[in-house]
Amino acid sequence: MNLKKIAIASSVFAGITMALTCHAVTVTATHTVESDAEFTIDWVDAGPTTTDAKDGEVWGHLDMTQTRGTPTFGKLRNPQGETSPGPLKAPFSFTGPDGHTARAYLDSYGAPIHNYAGDNLANGVKVGSGSGNTPFVVGTASRLTARIFGDQTLVPGVYRTTFELTTWTD
């Protein structure tokens, strides 16, 4: 928002106060509203279907598609996110039956996610198109693959997690 400040001054000369003439001034306040962007975020389940999960095995895919608006950048969060051990993994957890968890990571190798070692998915990592450092392309899905993080024994049942996407334009 841009505001122009107006200063009005007066002077005192030999005991006589003289007010400077004030002119009517129009102050214009401007605020830019970014275009509204709409997204669909879909989970495509890909396994594993057995209780013996191996490190790197595909767990599923997160498809983010901007359906309208000015192409935006994004920040993807997961409240159960962990600190990234390197630029190719953004780890997080799924909560399963009876409080059991499954650890997975978003594979950022050749994917639209931009993260470094030490980044935490709970705080958010940059996503978009390309390698995650360019805006989403309207109408084109940006796919992140989730893989099992370390060999795990899974309890049969449904596992859930939450992703939050915040977007902005440059």
From Swiss-Prot:
Keywords: Hemagglutinin, Signal
Signal peptide coordinates: 1-24
Domain of life: Bacteria
Role description: This protein is a non-fimbrial hemagglutinin that is specific for blood group M.
Name listed for the protein in its UniProt record: M-agglutinin
Lineage: Bacteria, Pseudomonadati, Pseudomonadota, Gammaproteobacteria, Enterobacterales
